Amino acid sequence: MANTLYDRTIAFAGICQAVALVQQVARDGHCDQDAFETSINAILNTSPANTIGVFGREADLKLGLECLVKGIDSTPSGSEVTRYIISLMALERKLSGRNDAMSQLGDRIQMAQRQTEHFELLDDQMISNLASIYLDVVSPIGPRIQVTGTPSVLQQTSNQHKVRALLLSGIRSAVLWRQVGGKRRHLIFGRKKMVEQAQILLARM
């Protein structure tokens, strides 16, 4: 994996896309299906040729790139996005320090990869299986991510599964961020450069 600004921007957009979709599902009970498929597929895509290969094409990360450019601001929605991103990255840091959990995560994802022989990627059963990986392996590492939204929407089991599967996708992208050399200082001092890179990518779509 190359450690370039481009690679970091792609990985961070992956986190942003998962978070933006969590917001959509938690609020409305549905979300951008193409972006959802990209984010879910990224969980299972563990041997990509390069960073963008995790997601497919740059256009498949449009929602995440848009969120990176204008979704992280001081509005209530932007503050929520920021909270989710910080929480996911903190959780991934704790997870990566636990070899037992990382090994278990790898095993469970391999099992999910085999299940795609029997289920469509976005089948309810498949989403439920991915949600259970998050619940069983990632969530116990703590701290728990508090998802806010419409109570009646979040009470529905299918939406809970989607949210957890998307949080797992966020963790996948946070792992990728670390693999391509992403550091906290890049978020504090280098975010403007990432925004500029994301704008270039969006402009050529």
From Swiss-Prot:
Its main location: cytoplasm. It is found in: Cytoplasm; Cell inner membrane. It is a peripheral membrane protein. This is High frequency lysogenization protein HflD homolog. Keywords: Cell inner membrane, Cell membrane, Cytoplasm, Membrane. It holds the Pfam family DUF489. NCBIfam families: PRK00218.1-2, PRK00218.1-4. GO terms for cellular component: cytoplasm; plasma membrane. Belongs to the HflD family. PANTHER family: HIGH FREQUENCY LYSOGENIZATION PROTEIN HFLD. It comes from Vibrio campbellii (strain ATCC BAA-1116).
